[in-house]
Every structure is written in structure tokens, then in C-alpha cells.
Amino acid sequence: MEENINERLSELGTKILATTRNELYIHMRFLDVALSSFAYVIDPSVNGVGTDGMCMFYHPGALGGMYRQNRVRMNRAYLHMVLHCILHHVTRRKGRDKTLWNISCDIAVESIIDHWHLKCIHMVQTRLRKDIYGQLERLSLIHISEPTRP
């Protein structure tokens, strides 16, 4: 009985992640290979979702809740993991302070996502995010350009 429940949860998690991947693909075809490069692995010890660069690990309850409550947030979480891998954040830490590295990489990835003006990933930026991006741009640590319009 318990094995059947775990199998069902795994199928549902895979379906949620595949649906999220497909929605992102519709808007970002240039990320085709990157979006499709992960195996999906159920892992109740994970807090939400995460990746090691090859697999996306997910807590079934957290994944289902995120998908049900806010599809944009789900899309952003998936894209966040993909961008971490594309930018080699998973493999380039070397001797750097782990906490500082992770926060810096998260800010870099979220900045990219926040400045791609696509409905499927759009969330209103908080004042804190705007202030941080402004400070980093003034220090020339990130460059934020306005999107070009046809």
C-alpha cells in the first residue's frame, strides 16, 4: 500500500515538473536542452526543490503545494535551478565561503529572471530587490539593461 502511494507521488511530481518545463519551453525555446536535462527524483528530505546539476530533487508535499498555489513561483523555481547549472554555480564554488557563494549566486540568478519580462515568470519586485539590484549596479557588480522592444 505504502509503495503504491510513493509511486503515485513520484508520478505526480514528475508530471508537475514536466508541465512546468513545458510551460517554460514555450516561452524560452533557446533553453530547450537545459530545461530537459534533468531526471526528477522524489526526496522527502529536501525542503521544496533542489538540484545537484543532474537531478531535480523534490519534496512531494512542497512541490504540489507550490504548483497549486502559484504557477509563476513554480516556473521561477525550475528556471532558477536551470540557470544555476548553466552558470556553473553548482561546480565553481571551490574554496569560497559556502553561504556567501550561495547567496551571491541566488542574487545573480534572480536578477536574470527578474529582468526577463515574460508573463510566465513575472512577479512584482519588492522594494528590497529593487534596492539591492540598484546598489549592485552602482558598484558595477551587475549590469541591468532594459529589454529591447521590437
Where are these regions (language model features)?
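Basic/hydrophobic alpha-helical interface regions
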Residues: M1-M74, Y78, V82-K119
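Ser/Thr-centric signal marking residues that sit
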Residues: T51, T148-R149
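Short secondary-structure capping/junction motifs at helix and strand boundaries
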Residues: D114-L136
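Conserved small/polar residues in nucleotide/adenosyl-binding loops
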Residues: I142-T148
